[in-house]
Curated annotation (Swiss-Prot):
Belongs to the Casparian strip membrane proteins (CASP) family. Keywords: Cell membrane, Membrane, Transmembrane, Transmembrane helix. It comes from Populus trichocarpa. Pfam families: CASP_dom. It is a multi-pass membrane protein. This is CASP-like protein 1F1. NCBIfam families: A_tha_TIGR01569.
């Protein structure tokens, strides 16, 4: 019986390490894909309409908040790709608490960027969809449905990215804490 306990305690950290690495790789790949998809949807969102001979167009570049979200996702996607490469190097070199702490700081910074981009884009998207009767801002999404749907999909994918980065931040923090203890 003591032999089985020793065998379990030796294999458990290896299984835990493999699970941690698998989770990290999976969520980093999903974060990269979500960043690319969200940026692409936002950058390509535009619509031109003709209302009584007046041509109006809506583009992401007309809104600083939408530009911020698009470029935030580009930056986060690039840095997430670099962190994936860094993770592969960390796995090959072995467990060093400092490496996991750097991953934690990276994930926290990327998560903070995405939170800012999502908050800004959600605010302006809400105004576009519902308007604000107190200030006289009219809703535009009833006229620019295609543009608003693409922007809304982009923001939704950014929130998915935020969830992935939150999971990465929590797992990296947990791993760096366990390594130090």
């Amino acid at each position: 019986m003591p032999n089985n306990e020793a065998k379990f305690s030796v294999n458990q950290p290896l299984k835990t390490q493999k699970l941690f690495i698998g989770v990290q790789i999976f969520f980093r790949i999903v974060a990269i894909a979500a960043s690319v998809a969200s940026s692409w949807l936002m950058i390509t969102s535009k619509q031109v309409i003709d209302i009584g001979g007046i041509v109006l167009d809506a583009r992401y570049s007309y809104s600083p908040e939408f530009k911020f979200l698009a470029f935030t996702n580009i930056v986060v996607g690039c840095f997430s790709l670099l962190s994936l490469l860094f993770l592969v190097l960390v796995v090959r070199q072995g467990s060093n608490p400092n490496h996991y702490f750097f991953l934690f700081l990276h994930d926290l910074a990327m998560m903070s960027l995405v939170v800012g981009g999502c908050a800004a884009a959600t605010t302006v998207g809400f105004l576009g969809k519902h308007g604000n009767s107190h200030t006289g801002w009219m809703q535009i999404c009833d006229n620019f449905g295609k543009f608003c749907n693409r922007a809304q999909t982009s923001v939704t994918i950014s929130y998915l990215n935020l969830i992935c980065l939150s999971i990465l931040t929590i797992t990296s923090a947990s791993k760096s804490r366990k390594m130090e203890a």
